[in-house]
Amino acid sequence: MRAPERGALIWLSFTPQSGREQAGRRPALVVSPSTYNSKVGLALVCPITSRVKGYPFEVALPEGGPVQGVVLADQLRSLDWRSREAELIANAPIAVVERVLQLVGALLSSP
């Protein structure tokens, strides 16, 4: 697989993990640009879960799409997409990507 693009939905291993972090092989949304991903070999990703809890940092994926569930925008991780055997699933809708980036930005910006 070549470097994933921002907005790509990929399969990726989140193991090892610690505490309340998501674990196992699961879908994720890539939020970093492909230029970064290809040069560094890492990608900033948010895991996706099918267990909707109604938390404010969950972003729902549209029903009927290739991946069901919610993107966990508050669980941003930097992972080696090659060693974790990333596989492209599809691209997320632009509205989902924009909302996730907005929430990640809110977490990282000054109060």
Where do the language-model regions lie?
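Conserved functional hotspots at enzyme active or ligand-binding sites that engage polyanionic ligands
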Residues: M1-P111
